[in-house]
């Protein structure tokens, strides 16, 4: 069989935070598949990168007092402990801000623009949302509102997470700025569009998405996006729409060729990052990227989550095809990972699964690799991490079944036969000298084809079940052969039987290790050392250990999961636990919690949302600001607040806050104050200065009561 050449990627994580367990699940799934391919002798380039561009990163960097480049670099510097810790074998990790990505993204754009059959890029003057308070055009992800297709609330400005619709931000119903909460205003701006609605794109994608590349459930969903269809609310959704691929300065990204002040929208250059990371790798090796991609036998695969199917099954293949490039051979879509019977992850409640915490507790990364493999399949179904099931599977399957096989047989070979393998012919002779052929070694070796195909099809759960079925058979054969009885004898015939049984068992263990190696790579290295063999590949399935082959002394290969480790893994942060609260003597915020009150006491305080319509300094006072508040009463309230040291009047106008609405009016030197605005501060103002006015999340309106 000729060697295959594969180019494999995972989705690019956005460079605004650490990896979460969902990232690690995807990387483990892809890594297992890649390791399997390498064990088949195939040449694989497995690459990843940080998705480094976009206004959210620009805004986060500004808040952190860093340049976007430094912000992204700091995030990237924290990737290695995760990848090394869980044995993820990427050949390269790059960034979409790399020179290679700038070069490739611009060239792909030019090729689309200059397509010989007619340009697939056009410009349109559009009305774009602008935040007058922040004085900037709003990125799609910083505009929220009602989906124009399915009318789901609080959807982002570029696509709906409920129905999957893609639209312009201006299509949102009742939009608001996620940065300030204000209603944005419209300003005209020239934008660049990729003409996905072009008949050429539609024809190509209708064929490409339905030719067997995609999982059936994914292909069926994608098929819906090509047609005019009725939504549940009676509205209609059209077919493929043109895709806005530009953003206005200020923006952290790649500037569009021949268009000063215009930048590629992050979703255009992000998938190009797959190619850029590969190019970076090949350039460093001294290999030609163009020659590599031009190889007609090259296979290209992307592992992604089901939340980004639209971009990878429509925009990405169309961009590649009409820019004259190879399209993916397949898009492998997986579901989400939930925790403990579908409970939503929450660190504060102790229902999150922090990958670094998992490692810091000394938990074996291959426990998690095996557990996820045992649950993953070729469909895009969600899977659940259940703590009890995790402990049971690892302790029963890996330790009780798999590792147990080696520990039972190795000791006899070392003590009685100088660690030498005997004749492993395939039958397990029982104490009466009769063959016990329930699971011949040749049969275990013959399972390689079935297990190999399951790996190839990403049916990891089925592969693990088949492997554990073999392990069960080996353990049953061992028990039926009763070698411990033979070990008590000094008769040559009995000892020969003992050596043969132990040799068969070790050979079975070797084969199981081979089959599990894509999932348990570190353990496989230990076993290879113990058995004194070369690195295992699938071609070794029929190459049994020869008679007289020496093995090493057996050392324990894997510990069981301790329930205390799982308890610690899901333990809420220490400051949230009653025990920690009892130990801590430092008063929160510099002052003790006030004496307890009843719910009736609290109900006497009427807290309302109020909009700050106007704010001005108070002449004669260095502490007070005069606030004009709209509390939904049909009139304005005048409230004085001692926040002048922390806020400029202009910064508060238009914001919403919390008002004590039923506080008795207070006559002051400067006028009457009709309530109180809530603000937070530390009791020790010298060491912890600052006053922080309370501001509700977007969506709250004047007059709403706080309960």
From Swiss-Prot:
E.C. designation(s): 6.1.1.10
Aminoacyl-tRNA synthetase among keywords: yes
Listed GO MF terms: ATP binding; metal ion binding; methionine-tRNA ligase activity; tRNA binding
Ligand binding (Zn(2+)): 147, 150, 160, 163
InterPro entries membership: aa-tRNA-synth_I_CS (IPR001412), Anticodon_Met (IPR041872), Met-tRNA-synth_bsu_C (IPR004495), Met-tRNA_ligase_1 (IPR023458), Met-tRNA_synth (IPR014758), Methionyl/Leucyl_tRNA_Synth (IPR015413), MetRS_core (IPR033911), MetRS_Zn (IPR029038)
Reaction catalyzed: tRNA(Met) + L-methionine + ATP = L-methionyl-tRNA(Met) + AMP + diphosphate
Iron keyword on record: no
Binding sites annotated in the UniProt record for ATP: 347
Motif 'HIGH' region in this chain: 13-23
GO biological process, one term: methionyl-tRNA aminoacylation
Subunit structure: Homodimer.
Functional description taken from the UniProt entry: Is required not only for elongation of protein synthesis but also for the initiation of all mRNA translation through initiator tRNA(fMet) aminoacylation.
Protein name in UniProt: Methionine--tRNA ligase
Organism field: Polaromonas naphthalenivorans (strain CJ2)
């Amino acid at each position: 069989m000729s060697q295959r050449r594969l180019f494999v990627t995972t989705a690019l994580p956005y460079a605004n935070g650490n990896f979460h367990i969902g990232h690690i699940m995807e990387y483990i799934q892809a890594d297992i598949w890649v390791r399997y391919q390498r064990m088949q002798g195939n040449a694989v380039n497995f690459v990843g990168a940080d998705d480094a561009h976009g206004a959210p990163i620009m805004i986060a960097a500004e808040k952190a007092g860093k340049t976007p480049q430094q912000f992204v670099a700091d995030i990237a510097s924290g990737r290695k402990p995760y990848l090394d810790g869980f044995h993820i074998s990427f050949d390269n990790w790059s960034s979409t801000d790399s020179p290679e990505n700038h070069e490739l993204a611009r060239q792909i754009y030019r090729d689309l623009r200059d397509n010989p059959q007619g340009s697939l890029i056009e410009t349109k003057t559009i009305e774009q949302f602008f935040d007058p308070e922040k004085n900037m055009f709003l990125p799609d992800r910083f505009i929220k509102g009602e989906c124009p297709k399915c009318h789901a609330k609080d959807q982002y400005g570029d696509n709906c997470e409920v129905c999957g619709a893609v639209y312009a931000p201006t299509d949102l119903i009742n939009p608001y700025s996620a940065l300030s909460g204000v209603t944005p205003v419209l300003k005209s701006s020239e934008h660049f569009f990729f003409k996905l609605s072009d008949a050429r794109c539609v024809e190509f994608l209708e064929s490409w998405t339905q030719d067997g590349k995609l999982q059936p459930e994914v292909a069926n969903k994608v098929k819906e996006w090509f047609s005019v269809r009725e939504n549940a609310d009676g509205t209609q959704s059209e077919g493929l729409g043109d895709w806005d691929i530009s953003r206005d300065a200020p923006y952290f990204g790649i500037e569009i060729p021949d268009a000063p002040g215009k930048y590629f929208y992050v979703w255009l250059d992000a998938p190009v990052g797959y190619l850029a990371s590969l190019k970076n790798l090949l350039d460093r090796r001294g290999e030609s990227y163009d020659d590599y991609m031009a190889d007609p036998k090259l296979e290209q695969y992307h592992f992604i989550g089901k939340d980004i199917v639209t971009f990878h099954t429509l925009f990405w293949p169309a961009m590649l095809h009409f820019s004259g490039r190879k399209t993916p051979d397949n898009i492998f879509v997986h579901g989400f990972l939930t925790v403990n019977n579908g409970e939503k992850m929450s660190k504060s409640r102790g229902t999150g699964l922090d990958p670094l915490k998992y490692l810091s507790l000394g938990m074996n990364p291959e426990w998690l690799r095996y557990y996820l493999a045992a649950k993953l399949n070729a469909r895009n179904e969600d899977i659940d991490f259940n703590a009890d099931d995790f402990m049971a599977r690892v302790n029963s399957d890996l330790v009780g079944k798999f590792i147990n096989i080696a520990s039972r047989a190795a000791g006899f070979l070392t003590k009685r036969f100088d660690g030498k393998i005997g004749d492993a012919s395939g039958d397990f002779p029982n104490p009466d000298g009769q063959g016990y052929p329930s699971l011949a070694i040749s049969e275990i070796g013959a399972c390689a084809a079935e297990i190999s195909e399951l790996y190839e099809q990403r049916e990891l759960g089925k592969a693990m079940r088949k492997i554990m079925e073999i392990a069960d058979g080996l353990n049953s054969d061992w028990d039926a052969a009763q070698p411990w009885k033979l070990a008590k004898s000094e008769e040559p015939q009995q000892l020969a039987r003992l050596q043969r049984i132990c040799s068969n068992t070790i050979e079975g263990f070797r084969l199981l290790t081979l089959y599990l190696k894509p999932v348990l790579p570190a353990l496989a290295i230990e076993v290879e050392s113990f058995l004194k063999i070369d690195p295992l590949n699938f071609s070794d399935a029929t190459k049994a250990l020869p008679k007289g082959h020496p093995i090493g002394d057996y050392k324990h290969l894997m510990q069981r999961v301790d329930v205390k480790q799982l308890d610690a893994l899901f333990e809420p942060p220490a400051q949230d636990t009653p025990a920690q609260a009892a130990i801590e003597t430092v008063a929160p915020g510099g002052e003790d919690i006030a004496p307890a009150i009843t719910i009736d006491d609290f109900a006497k305080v009427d807290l309302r949302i109020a909009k700050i319509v106007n704010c001005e300094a108070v002449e004669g006072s260095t502490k007070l600001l005069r606030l004009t508040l709209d509390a939904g009463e049909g009139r304005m309230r005048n409230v004085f607040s001692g926040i002048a040291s922390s806020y400029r009047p202009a910064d508060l106008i238009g914001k919403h806050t919390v008002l004590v609405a039923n506080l008795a009016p207070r006559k002051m030197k400067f006028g009457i104050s009709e309530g109180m605005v809530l603000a937070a501060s530390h009791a020790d103002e010298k060491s912890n200065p600052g006053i922080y006015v309370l501001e509700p999340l977007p969506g709250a309106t004047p007059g709403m009561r706080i309960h």
